[in-house]
């Protein structure tokens, strides 16, 4: 008999500024790493003000991780030290494995209405893969299957499997699943997940009950004391839902529907040494990576 996962913890994304001045909401980062292993960071960038995104993320290094960029609206111009140039457009995904090291830039441009929106997820690599050759999975919107389920539920499968349909991103070491799910009001979405994996949901818009219980959970909300706690059993937009143990998730909507990312992966369970865009296992490995970046020996594969 399957066990539906209960909510372990919920929290709201928090505003921050990254890159050369990009305003975004950080769903999770450094402080949550032990709970969300193998995932390190999730940024939500949504704005209709070009001043908040046009300066972008100029040239910077990565080593030891994968960055997964999912654009909802607008365009991101991408270039890297391997000589690649391209666009990540609305509905596209770029799954970049930095491995031993890559230097790249990401410059958001927005759409005709100056709207820019999307997400970037960072996933850790195990020690055995941190120095692998960098690689890309550039996936266009039309290559991402969308499955229609009972009640008008729709799910885009970026990575993983739903109803026998497999997403285009495969052969990832932590065996992740990455779905974009839309659940209309008055319906319930259930989905099997692997018991050994960590599972989270991130609410893009709308609201819903993210397990079968209706217990109230503490939410951090911006208030007079910045992190006041508010009790609620409904998870709304820009909320992270961290699940406990089990082999199935269930999301129910009443009057209003909900759209969310459902992300899961196998924990690596290794030490994490992290500073800025580089994530290794030890402080010595981290020191060496930045030393190599400064002296021009950072790139191990491809063009420098």
Where are these regions (language model features)?
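Jelly-roll (double-stranded beta-helix
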Residues: 1-304
């Amino acid at each position: 008999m399957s066990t539906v996962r209960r909510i372990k913890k919920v929290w709201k994304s928090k505003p921050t500024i990254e890159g050369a001045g990009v305003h975004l909401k950080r769903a999770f980062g450094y402080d949550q790493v032990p709970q969300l292993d193998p995932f390190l960071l999730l940024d939500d960038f949504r704005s209709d003000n070009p001043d908040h995104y046009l300066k972008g993320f100029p040239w910077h290094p990565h080593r030891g991780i994968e960055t997964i960029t999912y654009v909802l609206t607008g365009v991101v111009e991408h270039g890297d030290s391997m000589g690649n140039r391209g666009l990540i457009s609305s509905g596209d995904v770029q799954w970049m494995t930095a491995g031993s090291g890559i230097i790249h830039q990401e410059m958001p441009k927005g759409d005709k209405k100056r709207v820019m929106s999307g997400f970037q997820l960072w996933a850790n690599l195990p020690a055995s893969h941190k120095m692998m050759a960098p690689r890309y999975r550039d996936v266009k919107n039309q290559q991402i299957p969308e499955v229609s389920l009972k009640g008008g539920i729709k799910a885009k499968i970026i990575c993983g499997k739903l109803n026998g349909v497999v997403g285009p991103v495969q052969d990832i070491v932590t065996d992740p699943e990455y779905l974009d799910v839309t659940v209309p009001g008055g319906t319930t979405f259930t989905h099997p997940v692997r018991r050994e994996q960590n599972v989270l949901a991130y609410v893009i818009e709308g609201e819903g009950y993210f397990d079968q219980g209706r217990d109230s959970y503490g939410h951090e909300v911006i208030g007079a004391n910045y992190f006041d706690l508010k009790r609620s059993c409904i998870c709304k937009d820009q909320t992270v839902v961290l699940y406990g143990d089990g082999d199935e998730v269930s999301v129910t909507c009443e009057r209003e529907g909900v759209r969310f990312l459902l992300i899961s992966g196998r924990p690596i369970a290794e030490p994490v040494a992290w500073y800025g865009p580089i994530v290794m296992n030890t402080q010595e490995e981290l020191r060496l990576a930045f030393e190599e970046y400064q002296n021009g020996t950072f790139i191990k594969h491809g063009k420098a």
